[in-house]
């Protein structure tokens, strides 16, 4: 996590490389620290240093279309594109091989309920980024998909409604077309929530109440298979592997490794990736 004047550290990067992994860093900070465009250059310098230290990929901020992650009243894709431009310039000047991923917006249709001071629908936000020229300052478009309750092979049939964020194809088509089909997608979070093995899901996550662990495992494998064969998804990170928190934000319900230590998704993903 960045904060003004914080020096970049290579500890995570070195540790990952020593273990034979590449490392993608999603770099965010406190919304108050960027209010009014303050400290954009400080942030850009920080991510540039991470690139110099060997980061293989950097996601520039996170879910900047909601006021939990960006200052309320200032949510604007043009403003974010300015931060992205400065960051991209610094990153590429320090390490041209570092993959630059735009921050993935929160999938949402809530702007009508809460107002644009607090949230922008992600389709509007992504379109605004494209109009502001963000495509010139990214290697890959960041995407989050975390509210599915049906197979990613389906583009209809969600019992809630037909809103595009419900569907894997809806998210892919929306984000890919926003940049004129010219930029590949990077899923920095893709997961399916199952409360199986836990107490009841919090009420605001009740939409996933009927999703089983077996369905989670099947759908993750299907999503990876579709992404690999599509030619338009460069990277996909499963959210998540082994989180255990299960409070008002039930991250443990997204975990592949379940409370009983079983991991059905490990087996399905092993099959679809050919053992990699």
Label the predicted regions.
Residues 46-77, 98-109, 136-152, 185-190, ...:
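Active-site groove signature of glycoside hydrolases
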